[in-house]
């Protein structure tokens, strides 16, 4: 009976991976009493095949889940309609509650039938035995056997806890359960006394901003967190996971962040290969509808690097909702996992982000200043201009307030706190992070990210003359035009490098630098163009085109 109950309450099993013998001898440990025999080779190399009873019951429950999701998103309109029609009276609600109760009982019966179908399937019984054994004892052998299954990630045991690093226990500087530290926006109205009357006046606007951010705003900003989209993408995500596990020998892990969210990660270790770049770990931060299963992790993988991918809170196997605080909390535990469990030094870690992933990437760069480098692909400086682009002009004040208070993705501000090498990849046909049309390359917010970074690091170089020269270079629509502008100002790269190295040797590496203070106008122009070209590379593509491996380059440094 205990096993039958486990089958009723157990997670859905999606796939049984092919047996992987790579490095088995090196990773295996003596079998413990709680370890379970491995599955026979005949059961591998296919999706899990449920029996007819389980299959049909699963279909009914999945359909009910979709209907519930549709009802949830349409509930405000349905409530308004029922109220107008007078269906919310007690005489109408009581019979409806009876119908709802009957439906719940029927669904519970379907779940029991599904459990019986699982109980009659030897594959599922073996899986649930391994899962229960792993929850009792997370030995290396049990976890190795569990990794051969792809199932509902909610039942996966936690592999790494945010408090696990010994340096954080009792530390005042580390994150608390309230979350890691974020840069807070300045008050919208400076100098205004924060009296009780002013607070009361602001309350309606604050309530409106909160409701907009937690309903429409969050789902527009992170559509990948919408359940219906995840349901539609499920077959693609399962195929992507199978590729990472079976072909790349990826290892999945669940991390517990300081806010209680569980973060779904995938690690591909290339340190045992002959390629030197395998010693570097690239942590990938996906876009607003990206998942590590099918996202930007493929670029550094093809380039031969070790890779750690993770899903935003609320995406696929990760729990929670993707607000900035939760995003930063998730990124923090991912970096801690890379350092303290995977064994990478911060100097061997590169943060690579695509699009909206630039927020967590720049937060990690700001919070972990010893990391090797940051690569931002198709990212932006600040969310407000992009949010104003897609909303009506009459909503400008509401949109600005909502973003600043609840969805403040201040990438440029965070990036300027990082002292290490940075590379920006600008898509020349980007249709997402341009504020006008894709053809208007000067409206690409990647330009503003570059200018803010250079103005912070080299303020004496990025004066009016240097800024004008860089803007002309950014306006170039082709490589030929770029080279023409570069040669017009007769940029001497050897001279630029010697000037920068001399300054660094005398004053140290910390930014901002005062280099260019006593330099001629032509010298500042040359240096500004040289620095812009070293910090930004163009890629002739739209926003969602995967970055080819040959375009994945480490940032320039002296």
Curated annotation (Swiss-Prot):
Q: Which GO terms describe its cellular component?
A: membrane
Task: Indicate how the chain sits in the lipid bilayer.
Answer: Multi-pass membrane protein
Where the record annotates domain AB hydrolase-1, the positions are: 281-407
- Protein location: Membrane
Pfam families in the record, alphabetically?
ABHD16_N (PF22990), Abhydrolase_1 (PF00561)
Q: Which GO terms describe its biological process?
A: monoacylglycerol catabolic process; phosphatidylserine catabolic process; prostaglandin catabolic process
Sequence ranges on the Cytoplasmic membrane side: 114-558
- SUPFAM superfamilies associated with the record: alpha/beta-Hydrolases (SSF53474)
Indicate yes or no for the key word Membrane. yes
InterPro entries cross-referenced by the UniProt entry: AB_hydrolase_1, AB_hydrolase_fold, ABHD16_N
- Provide the active-site residues from the annotation: 355, 430, 507
Membrane-spanning segments? 60-80, 93-113
The record lists the catalysed reaction(s) as: 1-heptadecanoyl-2-(5Z,8Z,11Z,14Z-eicosatetraenoyl)-sn-glycero-3-phosphoserine + H2O = 1-heptadecanoyl-sn-glycero-3-phosphoserine + (5Z,8Z,11Z,14Z)-eicosatetraenoate + H(+); 1-hexadecanoyl-2-(9Z-octadecenoyl)-sn-glycero-3-phospho-L-serine + H2O = 1-hexadecanoyl-sn-glycero-3-phospho-L-serine + (9Z)-octadecenoate + H(+); 1-octadecanoyl-2-(9Z,12Z-octadecadienoyl)-sn-glycero-3-phosphoserine + H2O = 1-octadecanoyl-sn-glycero-3-phosphoserine + (9Z,12Z)-octadecadienoate + H(+); 1-heptadecanoyl-2-(5Z,8Z,11Z,14Z-eicosatetraenoyl)-sn-glycero-3-phosphocholine + H2O = 1-heptadecanoyl-sn-glycero-3-phosphocholine + (5Z,8Z,11Z,14Z)-eicosatetraenoate + H(+)
Q: Per its UniProt record, what Gene3D superfamilies does this chain match?
A: alpha/beta hydrolase
Record-level Gene Ontology MF annotations: monoacylglycerol lipase activity; phospholipase activity
The Swiss-Prot or TrEMBL record describes its family as follows: Belongs to the AB hydrolase superfamily. ABHD16 family.
Q: Which PANTHER family is this protein grouped with?
A: ALPHA/BETA HYDROLASE DOMAIN-CONTAINING PROTEIN, PHOSPHATIDYLSERINE LIPASE ABHD16A
Its recorded name reads Phosphatidylserine lipase ABHD16A
Its lineage opens with: Eukaryota, Metazoa, Chordata, Craniata, Vertebrata
